[in-house]
Amino acid sequence: MAWVLASTSPRRKELLAQAGFSHLDFSFQLVAPNIDETPLSTETAEQYVCRLALEKAQAGLALSSHVVKPQVLGSDTIVVLNGLILGKPIDQNDAKRMLALLSGQTHEVMTAVALTDGEHTFNRLCRTQVSFCELSAADIDAYVGSGEPMDKAGAYGIQALGGCFVKSITGSYSAVVGLPLVETRELLACMMQHT
């Protein structure tokens, strides 16, 4: 059996390495799934993020035909503020808009994880509350100018410069970064029990 991470996120790669089982020869390969991330008009934020994680895992499985008995992990993270889904910004103005919305507010970060081998599929959803301090226009401009927000849900990275804006967090820090470690370990353990 071989573990495959269906992601191009360097943060997920780093986090998955942390989730390794010390008593096993745990390593993983990377594949880059390409899925349509457009929300469906009828789905909730929870349904949306769970669907994306599952579709990434399934697309990763399709890309893993060269791997013997692949176990493919897909994950997705969104930021939700008052029912509004904030994905990755499309440009700098979009990043500034998102950060202005998050300023002084508490939002929810949802990270879904799905693991499949084609026969068995397991998934988890992790919800974390994050409160931001008030951000000035200068704060937002400087942060967006750093380039950091451009590939991150909600236009911030808690593990880097964006962490300076976080007043408090209730829930999983690693889920906000992009991969909830406790839930991921649970999925890996479930899969190992079923194979």
UniProtKB/Swiss-Prot annotation:
CDD domains: Maf
Primary localization class, coarse: cytoplasm
Cellular location(s): Cytoplasm
Protein name, as recorded: dTTP/UTP pyrophosphatase
InterPro entries in the cross-refs: ITPase-like_fam, Maf-like
Organism superkingdom: Bacteria
Transmembrane segments: none
Record site feature (Important for substrate specificity), residues: R11, T77, Q159
